[in-house]
Regions:
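Catalytic machinery of carbohydrate-active enzymes
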Residues: 1-245
Length: 245
């Protein structure tokens, strides 16, 4: 039970799963104690399966959350954070700039360690975890070569549509079913490499600081966190020798 003397700091967040995972280092920097997730006026609402998927991951990180629970005690409101959105900066920096956590024009969040910690799913230890969502694709990215190179170790996570689209386009690989973002995180945490495009699964991989290879959408490279082992492919050229074997 919280002490009555504990300072409570409540965040109102209007964004999607990836936006919220990218926001976690900002949440901690603000010493926040609760996040209230609300449906945005744009895009698919968080109400339903999206919030239901995200909540177990937030719970596992010690982040209390509620959905569409409005209150007068909001300390930080991110509703208009996209005022600071730019295609060429990360979703994390856009949100940090909006809340003046960093300079509003040029600020950058320095991330030097993982911001997510989960128990790895040991059944996937040493596998290459792949996800490809419908948005933010780059036709130059050599997915067929990735499947050829890592096929025996590869496993796909994602929706039925994402999986069917992937295997029809690039060849058969097995699928690992996940029911929520926490299970996605546990799968990625056990992997030797994560490969995917700009999606919530990417933000989980970056939060875990797992070696990764990203299919970068050249027109909006808004999901890049630099760290050793993170490779961002803009032009379709991949040096497989530099990646985990």
């Amino acid at each position: 039970m919280d002490s009555p003397f504990t300072t409570k700091v409540t965040i109102l967040h209007q964004g999607h799963i990836g936006d919220i995972i990218a926001f976690i280092p900002i949440y901690r920097k603000l010493n926040a104690t609760r996040i209230l997730v609300t449906d945005a006026a744009w895009g698919e609402p968080m109400t339903g399966y999206k919030y239901d998927s995200l909540k177990p991951l937030l719970d596992s990180q010690g982040i209390p959350s509620d959905l569409n629970q409005f209150t007068s005690s909001i300390d930080y409101d991110t509703t208009n954070w996209r005022e600071c959105y730019k295609d060429h900066i990360s979703l994390m920096d856009s949100q940090a700039r909006y809340l003046h956590v960093v300079d509003r024009k040029t600020g950058h969040m320095e991330i030097t360690e993982p911001w997510l910690k989960v128990e790895p799913n040991e059944s996937l230890r040493g596998r290459v975890v792949i996800n490809r969502s419908a948005r933010y694709r780059n036709d130059k990215f050599p997915w067929s070569k990735v499947v050829e190179h890592y096929g025996k170790d590869a496993v796909f996570i994602g929706t039925d549509h994402e999986y069917n689209d992937f295997v029809q386009s690039f060849g058969q690989i097995p699928r690992h079913l996940t029911k929520d973002c926490l299970e996605v995180a546990r799968a990625i945490a056990a992997s030797k490499l994560y490969v995917g495009n700009q999606s919530s699964a990417y933000w989980i991989a970056a939060g875990l600081r797992i070696p990764l290879l990203q299919e970068v959408y050249e027109h909006a490279p808004n999901s890049i966190i630099r760290y050793p082992g993170a490779v961002y492919c803009f032009d379709g050229n991949i040096d497989f020798e530099s990646l985990p074997k």
